[in-house]
UniProtKB/Swiss-Prot annotation:
Coiled coil: none annotated. It comes from Flavobacterium psychrophilum (strain ATCC 49511 / DSM 21280 / CIP 103535 / JIP02/86). GO terms for biological process: glutamyl-tRNA aminoacylation. Monomer. It catalyses: tRNA(Glu) + L-glutamate + ATP = L-glutamyl-tRNA(Glu) + AMP + diphosphate. This is Glutamate--tRNA ligase.
Amino acid sequence: MSKQVRVRFAPSPTGALHIGGVRTALFNYLFAKKHNGVFYLRIEDTDQNRFVPGAEKYILEALKWLGISPDETIGKNEKFGPYRQSERKHLYKQYADLLINSGWAYYAFDTSESLDTLRKITEAAGNTFIYNHTVRETLDNSLTNSPEKVAERIANGEDYVIRFKTPVNETLHLKDIIRGDIKFETNLLDDKVLFKSDGMPTYHLANIVDDHLMETSHVIRGEEWLPSMPLHVLLYRAFGWEAPEFAHLPLILKPVGNGKLSKRDGEKLGFPVFPLQWKTNEGTSLGYKENGFFPETVINFLAMLGWNDGTQQEIFSLEELVQKFDLNRIHKAGAKFDPEKNKWFNHQYLVKKEDSTLAELFLPILASKGIVTNLDYTTKVVALVKERAHFVNELWDLSDYFFIAPTSYDEKATKNWKEETPELMKQLIVVLNGIEDFTSLNIETIVKDWMTQNEIGMGKVMQPFRLSLVGKMMGPHLFDIIEMIGKKETINRIEKAIATL
């Protein structure tokens, strides 16, 4: 690309970062890294009424956990700082005044009460009230007041807003990287408020000013901002600035039904919609981290929501995503969220991890259950059972018999315990006692030779043998279990089963 790529993630600190916002951040990050550009984070906190303490810190921590921290943000490489809009508000009034002076904006003194009244009258007549070119020259603003009167009212401290003066009778031909050519009729647009009576800019003005001053090359954001695109392009024209390129991402859709994924969907169907835990007065919402997902899992499944590389490949490292990412391969249609597929992704990453790494994550779970063990033994256990796990916290249910003897036996499996079983198990104990080299392959060879020589059917021994050691008909290769728990423990468990069953 001819100019340096600079892209931003610009959330509002109004609560926990939703998974849809995380995907927007991810796609910006991938695009920046693909083109050796800069990914920066800007906090858009102009709406102080919706500001939530702790939300800004949460956003930064979530991006850090996911491994997609910004190159520039608050307190980090502040080349174009400040990166909080509330600390830049002195700038916005200057630019609002520029628009006033160039005729692209005007002061409006209409009270909310007068506009509400006008809105009700219009709706009663079966129409929709829009503050635009059809009514602006009949309302209380600087287009209908003399310059002297306007100056007097402002000097007297009267409340006002600054509205954009949308051009009339124009068709805007705009281009979106994902959606292609788009047309907008300016006559259908309203005169948006750019500067509020509280002295703060609206999103539209602050966004355009900051994107220009921070040299943003591409705006990659959710499709909910597509209706704002014509206003934003017109603002660039009004200022005489070159507009960035735009790419509006498809929605993340509900797993069932129609519409955009929401926090309520997660609560109803039992899956997280936040990257990290979020606490409010109403309660605590666990995030993907607390639910046992690896950060690379979240990155991977979010990347596949609305994008693919044109192949059948589904598992991508962050480095591979950077290499293959292309905005032109993002779909226009919304992407359905699939909680079960996300678990599959986590399983793929779990089985790829080093056994010792998983063991280190598993040890605190074992300690919480009063199990005293070591990393070496736990690593061997993990190697035998991880293929069946989606999450680290599932390892206990898959491997508890490696650490404690069964306290009960699966009722269905006890049907394999026949009248002759106790005698066969006693003979098996004798065989096991005679084995010196107590390793999996050697134990298996000797036990199977004994069964063959005595013409004992495999099922008559192996099923009750597994039931004695595990308590159920599951688990890895039986002789691997035997080697792990050792001769003494193996025999003790068989004797307990004989006495119990």
